Curated annotation (Swiss-Prot):
Organism: Drosophila melanogaster
Segments of skewed composition (Low complexity): 272-297, 305-346
GO biological process: neuron fate determination; Notch signaling pathway; regulation of DNA-templated transcription; regulation of neurogenesis
Biased composition (Basic residues): 45-58
Name used for this protein in its record: Hairy/enhancer-of-split related with YRPW motif protein
Short name of one Pfam family: Hairy_orange
InterPro entries: bHLH_dom, HES_HEY, HLH_DNA-bd_sf, Orange_dom
């Protein structure tokens, strides 16, 4: 019995090992129907092996259950982290920070999109081609950007010389435009206001002169259009062409006195004294202002006119000396009346004293004195308004001395008016 049990023990042990955990061995139940059966000592090894096998199986089962428990906890932890990212509960401390970060990110992104859209709308309004296409169809963002690039390229091609921009040239262009407008207004004034014919020689000469002048200014402006013609340090108030050569018509400098541009020849309706005053006044103005107005009246013409007038005055003086020999008492009375008058006449001759000393031309002044001498007859009073001529009847006095002037009117004779002789010159 013991031997059989001992022999059957390995088989039972082998069968029980192959059976797996939790399976009741049928041999054990068959041989030991009673639950209180005590195995023999020989079976101690098998029992020990069974116990060790069961313990190993239980240990392995415990390890498997432990591993399963750890894996399930890891999955639960991962799921909880993912769920916390998706569904943030306000009870957690880091949930508020995550929520605020998400909100800030959304607000920043919205602002960025709004800024891009507003800039594209502004470009669509500013670019001409995009503005023209705006009414026909809705423009996409890429199309707006493409039209903007094309517009910038066209601007760059048109303004390649933007670095060599010359403000002086622009000012000169405006000046030429204004000059042409003024010339057109002058032509209109001569026809409509002055009643001058369109084919009038004076009008034609004036317009041709203005056209030639503006052409010269345009040529001078083009000559100054070189890159080195303008420097930023040049003052803007010095004129349009500070660095350029003067045009041929720029020699007509503007006079300091605005009344210096007067007629270069005396009017025929003026008296000889007024003509001499006009000539002397123009010469003094031209010398004091330093302008080139006297070029229109050469110096030899002035000397020839003054010499001819001097000869005429000498003839007049000779005739008047013969007449004054008959009226000696009238000359004495007139001398007594005119001697206290140098201070009254001084302001007439003060302006032209320098010119008279240079040209040696006597100046004749028309005086209308209210205090007339009583000895002058009624016949001579009718000619008191006419210009009178001085007479150097006193010995030791020069006729060029303008401080003492003698005036006399012959009885019954008109004063000498050499209009024909002066018109011949």
């Amino acid at each position: 019995m013991d031997h059989n049990m001992h022999v059957n023990a390995p088989s039972l042990h082998h069968w029980g090992y192959a059976a797996g955990p939790g399976v009741v061995m049928p041999g054990a139940t068959a041989t030991t129907p009673q639950s209180h059966w005590v195995p023999p000592p020989q079976s101690h090894h098998s029992a020990h092996s069974n116990h060790s096998h069961g313990h190993s199986q239980g240990h392995s089962h415990g390890i498997g259950s432990l591993k399963r428990t750890l894996s399930e906890s890891d999955c639960d932890d991962l799921y909880s982290e993912e769920s916390s990212k998706e569904q943030i509960s306000p009870s957690e401390p880091g949930s508020c920070q995550l929520m605020s970060r998400k909100k800030r990110r959304g607000v920043i992104e919205k602002k960025r999109r709004d800024r891009i859209n507003s800039s594209l709308t502004e470009l669509k309004r500013l670019v001409p081609s995009a503005y023209e296409k705006q009414g026909s169809a809705k423009l996409e963002k890429a199309e707006i950007l493409q039209l903007t690039v094309e517009h910038l390229k066209s601007l760059q091609s048109k303004t390649l010389d933007s670095l060599s921009y010359d403000p002086q040239r622009v000012a000169m262009d405006y000046h030429i435009i204004g000059f042409r407008e003024c010339a057109a207004e002058v032509a209109r004034y001569l026809v409509t206001i002055e009643g001058m014919d369109i084919q009038d020689p004076l009008r034609l000469r004036l317009m041709s002169h203005l056209q030639y002048f503006v052409q010269q200014r345009e040529l001078s402006a083009k000559s100054c259009a070189s890159p080195g013609g303008w420097s930023p340090a040049a003052p803007s108030s010095s004129g349009y062409q500070p660095n350029c050569a003067a045009a041929p018509y720029q020699s007509y400098a503007a006079p300091a006195n605005p009344g210096a541009y007067v007629s270069s020849y005396p009017t025929l309706s003026a008296s000889p004294s007024q003509q001499a005053q006009q000539l002397g006044g123009r010469t003094s103005v031209s010398r004091t202002s330093g302008s080139a107005v006297t070029e229109s009246l050469p110096s030899h013409d002035l000397h020839s006119d003054s010499s001819s007038q001097q000869q005429q005055q000498q003839q007049q003086q000779q005739q008047q000396q013969q007449q004054h020999q008959q009226q000696q008492h009238q000359q004495q009375q007139q001398r007594t009346q005119t001697t206290p008058q140098p201070t009254q006449q001084q302001h007439y001759t003060h302006d032209h004293s320098a010119v008279h000393s240079e040209q040696q031309v006597p100046t004749y002044i028309e005086l209308t004195n209210s205090n007339r001498p009583a000895a002058i007859g009624s016949d001579s009073l009718s000619y008191s308004a006419a210009p009178q001529y001085p007479v150097s009847g006193l010995p030791g006095q020069d006729y060029n001395n303008s401080s003492v002037l003698q005036y006399a009117t012959p009885n019954g004779a008109k004063p000498y008016r050499p209009w024909g002789a002066e018109m011949a010159y």
